[in-house]
């Protein structure tokens, strides 16, 4: 009975990590496509030029792909070294997530202050030749979230000139509508809009985060269960 349960656990872990690995491959592909087609897409901060949406997706995709590969191969081959590596990688990711969350809440005011400062400095790159991705990202955010600038529409005056904002800041978008127009604009800054979006969707985001946490803990538990079984028997069990 125990042997049958462990056999089921082995293949369940293999299947789960195979899906995990495929998702990682997909994310890596999307990240590479964004990097090639959009350049530094969503590189809002000049202080961290490598921290673009494309690079983040590539990094996350690579981590997911490597983790899924370790779990997949470790489960199907009943390899203790791979299973232990899978456990350690998940543990490091879990600890890193917890540390980042704690630091974020402890230094929330400083994070907000520095983020606004960096984003405003990033606006200066809006019309630069090598940052078409940043321009597209700002245009999409302002059009979709009905906002303008970082704190308000006046942030653009230092970039585009007095009384001039991107056309996507207009309530009714048209060619040249952002020039000498300070009335029919979205007046709320995008930073507050994004914060409000997170606040409005905190329950959904919390649920997703909890599901990820449970998935990581289960992955660690399953891998250690298989590891201990293989360690005790000293050989593979027949599947």
Swiss-Prot record:
Entry keywords, A to Z: Glycoprotein, Membrane, Transmembrane, Transmembrane helix
PTM comment text: Glycosylated.
Record's subunit section: Found in a complex with GP6.
Entry-linked SUPFAM superfamilies: Tetraspanin
Database matches in InterPro entries: Tetraspanin/Peripherin, Tetraspanin_animals, Tetraspanin_CS, Tetraspanin_EC2_sf
Gene: TSPAN9
Entry-linked Gene3D superfamilies: Tetraspanin
Protein name, entry field: Tetraspanin-9
Membrane spanning stretches: 14-34, 56-76, 86-106, 204-224
Main location: membrane
GO cellular component, one term: plasma membrane
Organism of provenance: Ovis aries
